[in-house]
Amino acid sequence: RHRLGDDTRRWVPKHKKPLRDFFRHDLPWQTMQPIWKKEFVKQLGGFDEGFARHQDVELHTRALMLPSVRVEQFPGPIDCYYRVGEERRSDGIARRSEKLVDATLHYYERFMPDADRLGMRSALVGTLHRIQLQLLYHGREEQISRAELTQLEKRLFPKEIWRSIPLWKRFLFRVSR
């Protein structure tokens, strides 16, 4: 958007299970909203710069998996704003979507063992669906071509991942189209 506060979307932290929500890519907060102690972030090893995107999501996910982490949320009036710089938009929707798919797969593969261990595989599969919906939106808005959409979906759901998703969820992914 163009002016401070002209976007109606809000990040109001009121999630009961933030780890599950991060796995589903239903992000409970934006990078600048949590307050972590410096020692805690150092203990985590900081951001994983191996992630081209989702570095913040990856950091918060690792933090929330620690049994000792304590999270409190304080919904209230807006106290911060953020914007996406135009330089991040210069690639075009198709290229940004490719990067998003790659980062999503990196996140999915990185956290699948943890999601399995915690009984949250289904939530992590939700992150794929969330990204698929974004791709479908770009396709419907004709921001990407039908061919680009098809390629991006194939990239998002390689055969080994597609086969690991329960049949009923695969059905839902197809119905979403």
Task: Enumerate the predicted regions with their spans.
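Amphipathic alpha-helical protein-interaction segments enriched in hydrophobic
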Residues: M120-L136
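Conserved nucleotide-sugar donor-binding catalytic segment
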Residues: R3-K99
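Alpha-helix C-capping/helix-to-loop hinge sites
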Residues: L44-F47, D114-L118, Q134
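Generic macromolecular interface patches on structured domains
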Residues: R70, D114, L118-R121, R163
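Membrane-interface aromatic/basic loop that binds lipid-linked glycans or pyrophosphate carriers
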Residues: L133-R177
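Hydrophobic alpha-helical core bundles mediating ligand binding, dimerization, or RNAP-core interactions
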Residues: V57-H60, Y108, L128
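Catalytic core of nucleotide-sugar-dependent glycosyltransferases
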Residues: G76-E86, D91-G119, E141-P158
